[in-house]
UniProtKB/Swiss-Prot annotation:
Keywords: ATP synthesis, ATP-binding, Cell inner membrane, Cell membrane, CF(1), Hydrogen ion transport, Ion transport, Membrane, Nucleotide-binding, Translocase, Transport. The keyword Cell membrane applies. It is found in: Cell inner membrane. InterPro entries: ATP_synth_asu-like_sf, ATP_synth_asu_C, ATP_synth_asu_C_sf, ATP_synth_F1_a_nt-bd_dom, ATP_synth_F1_asu, ATPase_a/bsu_AS, ATPase_F1/V1/A1_a/bsu_N, ATPase_F1/V1/A1_a/bsu_N_sf. Gene3D superfamilies: 2.40.30.20, ATP synthase alpha/beta chain, C-terminal domain (1.20.150.20), P-loop containing nucleotide triphosphate hydrolases (3.40.50.300). Belongs to the ATPase alpha/beta chains family. Signal peptide: none annotated. CDD domains: ATP-synt_F1_alpha_C, ATP-synt_F1_alpha_N, F1-ATPase_alpha_CD. One of its GO terms (molecular function) is ADP binding. The record marks 362 as: Required for activity. It is a peripheral membrane protein. This is ATP synthase subunit alpha.
Amino acid sequence: MEIRADEISRIIREQIKDYGKKVDVAETGTVLSQADGVARIYGLAGAAAGELLEFPHGTRGLVLNLEEDNVGAAIMGAFEHIREGDPVKRTGKIAEVAVGEELLGRVVDGLGSPIDGRGPVNAKHTRKIEIKAPGIVQRKSVHEPMQTGLKAIDALVPIGRGQRELILGDRQTGKTAVAIDTILNNKGNNLYCFYVAVGQKQSTVARVVEILKQHGAMEYTTVIAANASDPAPMQYLAPYTGVTMAEYFRDTGRHALIIYDDLSKQAVAYRQLSLLLRRPPGREAYPGDVFYLHSRLLERAAKLSEKEGGGSLTALPIIETQAGDVSAYIPTNVISITDGQIFLESNLFYQGVRPAINVGISVSRVGGSAQIKAMKQVAGSLKLELAQYRELAAFAQFGSDLDKATQETLARGERLVELLKQGQYSPMPVEKQVIQIYAATQKDENGQGWIRQVPVEEVGRYMRELVEFLDARHPGVAKTIAEKKALDDGIRSQLDAALREFRGVFQVEGQA
């Protein structure tokens, strides 16, 4: 056999030319066990906490436990097909989510993937889900108002941009309604809204999206939904996904609002994960770091300093109480983290006082400095008067012989309660709130309240028609209040004149 050196060298040259240096190295482990969306994996010694893993069929997992001989991971998505012995790959990436204007108007799941049937989100930017909250130097104190459009909140428990205000109450007391009203009220205010639904029924989330669409609010809102049927890891992660999306607007010098509905269900999902990962249980079987779960989330809401762009992220976390018990574990945790709370009471709700805010224990620790001057001027004594009324009303049930001063306080309190009632999905601009509260709290030329002679059941109609009357006859008054944000003597005299004029008109209509 003839050996042809040139042919051999040609073959070798071709082989060398086709040789690639690229070697695919992947650290692979094996599933030891899988139960309820939590897998134990052997062989991933280099895995990092919070790292994403790749299971068969493209399913993702998140590393939560690092143990001596195995790794505990939460499976993101369907886990029924994952079996013992399945291979698992490290990705080397920490969980990230798409951010940007492209997400506005969309409904996404707990990992930021669209679930509204409108195709992919072509976002230009991504961000890590777990990042550190801004430090003290990067922050500025809360000083700009974030109007909710609800008289009871804007007057008594005002919220500022960058604040964390907890909404808590029993189920079916109007917690979500308060949050949705806040979104609707900020149409045209350059506030980008994020609604995170955790553990809700799909029908409930669909209804919220429909309401937002009807009022044209989806244009500036993103809905992040981890429904009741989704695995616990998705419910645990959804609030972090939402806050990461909202932070993009805060960090680009804009203003954002995030609503967590609700964090009780996130805590339950985290408890489920922790127990499956065999972490030691504490009070009410929650793990020891359940406080940190919420604190690291809510600390990411902030008002940034001018040097950092002056953006803000306001958070409205919602907590569901059991039988009005605000001293339970999760409610007390979140109360201590936030800058105030709005407590909704089922008794008030069933009495027809809606929004059913208990003024006595609802408080805003930093919002007072963000309230506009006009509102401070008219609503200064409102909280005290309502508290006195509640106290006297409790005693008045037992005695019929009341002195004149007590009767006067009760009559005034009844009218103030009526004033603060407001229909669902009908938020009101702050200047109109100021006009209504001025009419309810100020006195006329005879030293009596402007609405003292109005029957209690007519107060709601009086307030509605007063605003309509001013819009028609004195449109400049509301406009001036909106511009000046304060009541000077000129505006007060204009309001008094308008109220005198309206008193005659309203009485005629009432008698007719």
